Amino acid sequence: MSTRTPLPTVNERDTENHISHGDGRQEVTSRTGRSGARCRNSIASCADEQPHIGNYRLLKTIGKGNFAKVKLARHILTGREVAIKIIDKTQLNPTSLQKLFREVRIMKILNHPNIVKLFEVIETEKTLYLIMEYASGGEVFDYLVAHGRMKEKEARAKFRQIVSAVQYCHQKRIVHRDLKAENLLLDADMNIKIADFGFSNEFTVGSKLDTFCGSPPYAAPELFQGKKYDGPEVDVWSLGVILYTLVSGSLPFDGQNLKELRERVLRGKYRIPFYMSTDCENLLKRFLVLNPVKRGTLEQIMKDRWINAGHEEDELKPFVEPELDISDQKRIDIMVGMGYSQEEIQESLSKMKYDEITATYLLLGRKSAELDASDSSSSSNLSLAKVRPNSDLSNSTGQSPHHKGQRSVSSSQKQRRYSDHAGPAIPSVVAYPKRSQTSTADSDLKEDGIPSRKSSSSAVGGKGIAPASPMLGNAGNPNKADIPERKKSPAVPSSNTASGGMTRRNTYVCSERCAADRHSVIQNGKENSAIPDERTPVASTHSISSATTPDRIRFPRGTASRSTFHGQPRERRTATYNGPPASPSLSHEATPLSQTRSRGSTNLFSKLTSKLTRRNMSFRFIKRLPTEYERNGRYEGSSRNVSSEQKDENREAKPRSLRFTWSMKTTSSMDPSDMMREIRKVLDANNCDYEQRERFLLFCVHGDGHAENLVQWEMEVCKLPRLSLNGVRFKRISGTSIAFKNIASKIANELKL
C-alpha cells in the first residue's frame, strides 16, 4: 500500500514533546527506565521517522479533544493494538488534574470483562499517556444509528453485560455518572465494554455527592433538581434510559432545549412502544422511578424476569472478581526472552505498577487479531475488527450457559478472549522481539507524519476495546453477548438502510462552585411548562434511504452534533479528558441540544450555549488535490504511463473483507475498480472533494466550510464474502447527521452499481 498524503484541512499540528522522558508522578505511575523500546523485528519493523511512545508505535489519531487526543498504536513487543490517550497536563487546572488522577486510580482497580482495561501509565512533565484497550467494534450508539433498535433478545444480551459491569463498579464503591450509549463500546466479538470513567467517583454509604454531571437525556431527575445523591441511584436511572434506547432506538426523554428536556424528565412520563414486551416495560418501571429511594438496586434488578429470560438456569449474579493471575509461567518465559529479568517481572506484577512490564504481561494474555492478518495491512483496516470472515460453526465448546443462542464464532475469534480459556491465548510460534535499551529521548515523536483527522473517542480512545482482561485468570465472561441472526443477514440495500436516527449527546458537569447557576436554571426551568405529556411518535426523517424505520421516534433535531468513533476517526464532540476545564461549570466542549434552542436566560445556560457552539471548522477545499494514485499514474482511467509492476500491483489489490454489513449502503457484483470509478464520477458530479487514501478507500468532503453543512466521510469498496458481493461502506467522520444524510443519500442514489 502506498503512503497516504493527508489533505491539508485535516492535518494535525505537532504535539509538544510527546516523548517518555522525565520522572512520572508516583501516585499515577511507576516506570522503569526502559520504556522506549523500539521495534527491531518482523512484527514491528519500522523506520526511524515513525513516531513512538514508549514501547508503542503510533499508527493514527482516532480521537481528539480540547486537552487530549487518542491514538491507535501497536505494542512493539507483542504486536497487540492499543489505544493511547495523550493528555496535555499543561492545559489543565489543579482541579482538573486532580480529577484526571482520580480517573486513573479508578481504572487501575477495575477488572471486569465488560469494562475497558488499563494497561500502562506513562507520565512526563507535561504529558500523561494512558495505554488502554482498543475498541474495534465501535460504539453502541453508532450501532443503533446504523442498524436501528435491537430485538429484545439482542438487547438482553448486551444489557446483562452492562448491568453486570455497573453492579461490579457499585460493589467496589465506584459510581460511573456518565452512562450513555456513546460510552458503551463493542469489542470484536460484539461484547460490551464500558468506557470513559472521567466523571466517575468513589462514594461512601451515608455520604452524599452533589456534582451534577453526565449527559442530560440520561441524567436522573434529582440531578436536574440540584439535590445531593448517594451515587448508585443515578447510574440506575441512566441504565433505564439505556435499556429503553436499546429496545426502541430512541430516547425516553427528549426536548428541543434543556428546559423542555428537564420538564419531561421531572414529569417521568415516556411512551411505551407497541412492540415492547410487558416484561421489558415492567423492568423499565423499576429503573425510571422519580423517587431515588424507591428506585431499584442492581442486585434486585439482576433477579428480574426479563433480565433472565432464556437464562433461567443461569440467573445473572454479581460478578466475582477472580484472583489476579500474576504467575503465568508461559508469559513470564516469553518476557524473559524479551530481556526482562524474573525479579523485575515479579516486582512489577506484585505491585501492579502499570509500567511497561505490567503492560507486556497483560497484552501477552490477549490473542491479537492482527497476528492473523498480514503485517502489511493498511492502517485503515486497523480501525475495524480484523477477523476472518468465515465462521467455524462447530467451535462452540467450553462456553458458559450464558452463551446459549449465541452465534458461533471461529476458533481464531474465540482465542481473542483469554478468559474463555484455561490459559492465555499466546501464539506458540510467534517470535517475540527483545526490548531495546534505547531511551525514549532518542525517539522524537513527530505526529505530522501520521494522517490524522478531526475525530472523536471516549476515554478509551477508540474507546479502546479489546476482550476480557487477562487478569481474570480462567474465569469466563458470565455475560457473553448473544448475537442474533441479524449479524448473518445479507447486506441491506440502500433503499432499506436505517441511518442517523439518533443524535449524539454531550456530557457536562456543574461543580459545587456553580450551584447558584444550576439553581437558577432549575428555577427558571419551571416557566412556560405547558408541554404535552406524551410525544407523538414520528418516523425518522434521517434515514439514508427513502424507507424509514417506522417504529423509531424522530431523534435528530438539526443538532450540529459531533460524534465519537472507534476505529474510525470523526470530529470530537467532547474533550477526551473528562474533567472540567478552566470554567468551573463545564467539563467539555459540547454542542447545543438544538440549533433552535434559546440563547439562555441564566448564567449556566449562557455558558453552555457560548462555550458549546465553538467550531474549529473554518475551512473549505477550493480544489481537489491530486491523489497518490493520480500522481503515480495509478488512477483508474488515467492515460499516464504505468509500469507493468504497478499494473500488477493494482490488479492484485483486493478490497478489504468486512465481517459486518450494517454500514453498507449498497451492494454490487461489479468489479471493485469499476465501482471506484463510478464513485469518483458521482463525487465529481456533486462537487465533492476527495482524496484516495488507499486503493479502495476515499476520504470525502462536501460543504462550504460552515459547521452546519460541512461534512467529512469515508467511502470504501469492501468485499462481503458471505454474500459473494462487493459493497460501498459509508462512514461519517464529521458534520451533522442531517448534512451527512443529505449528501450520502444523494450519492448512494446516483451510483449506478
UniProtKB/Swiss-Prot annotation:
GO terms for cellular component: cytoplasm; dendrite; plasma membrane. CDD domains: MARK1-3_C (cd12196), STKc_MARK (cd14072), UBA_MARK3_4 (cd14407). Gene3D superfamilies: DNA helicase RuvA subunit, C-terminal domain (1.10.8.10), Kinase associated domain 1, KA1 (3.30.310.80), Phosphorylase Kinase, domain 1 (3.30.200.20), Transferase(Phosphotransferase) domain 1 (1.10.510.10). Residues 56-307 form the Protein kinase domain. It comes from the Eukaryota. It is a peripheral membrane protein. Residues 695-744 form the KA1 domain. Its main location: membrane. Belongs to the protein kinase superfamily. CAMK Ser/Thr protein kinase family. SNF1 subfamily. This is MAP/microtubule affinity-regulating kinase 3. It comes from Mus musculus (Mouse).
